[in-house]
Amino acid sequence: MKTFTAKPESVKRDWYVVDADGKTLGRLATELARRLRGKHKAEYTPHVDTGDYIIVLNAEKVAVTGNKRTDKVYYRHTGYVGGIKQATFEEMIARNPERVIEIAVKGMLPKGPLGRAMFRKLKVYAGTEHTHAAQQPQVLDI
């Protein structure tokens, strides 16, 4: 019997909505990355994007343990000499709460074109409203 390989055109992708309210950031991001890759499906193939679309709501209410709210630091670089910028978790949540979940999940996905395609299926919103009602997403309890 030959090994089954999923074809990109035959993959069925579902839409799921996840509420991040009170969820621990790392544990939530791990499960989101797993589902974006498609590892929860029997037809998972490493070189094919078999994952689902995921909508994350209430990104500003995501939880972190310990002192990470004040001690966890995110770094970025402007591209100019001496242009390193830093922001704590608290500042990131205040300024752009969606970005915190996006950074956590993106680091858990493959690097390269396939990983970027998987990351594009993640939709993160700060509040409880989203613009994907037409896709009829199912509620996913993580």
From Swiss-Prot:
One annotated Gene Ontology cellular component of this protein: cytosolic large ribosomal subunit
Cited Pfam families: Ribosomal_L13
SUPFAM superfamilies reported for this sequence: Ribosomal protein L13
Keyword field contains Oxidoreductase: no
Any one GO BP annotation for this protein: negative regulation of translation
Keywords associated with the record: Ribonucleoprotein, Ribosomal protein
Cited InterPro entries: Ribosomal_uL13, Ribosomal_uL13_bac-type, Ribosomal_uL13_CS, Ribosomal_uL13_sf
GO molecular function: mRNA binding; structural constituent of ribosome
Subunit structure: Part of the 50S ribosomal subunit.
Family affiliation: Belongs to the universal ribosomal protein uL13 family.
Record function comment: This protein is one of the early assembly proteins of the 50S ribosomal subunit, although it is not seen to bind rRNA by itself. It is important during the early stages of 50S assembly.
Protein name: Large ribosomal subunit protein uL13
Species of origin: Serratia proteamaculans (strain 568)
Gene name of the encoded protein: rplM
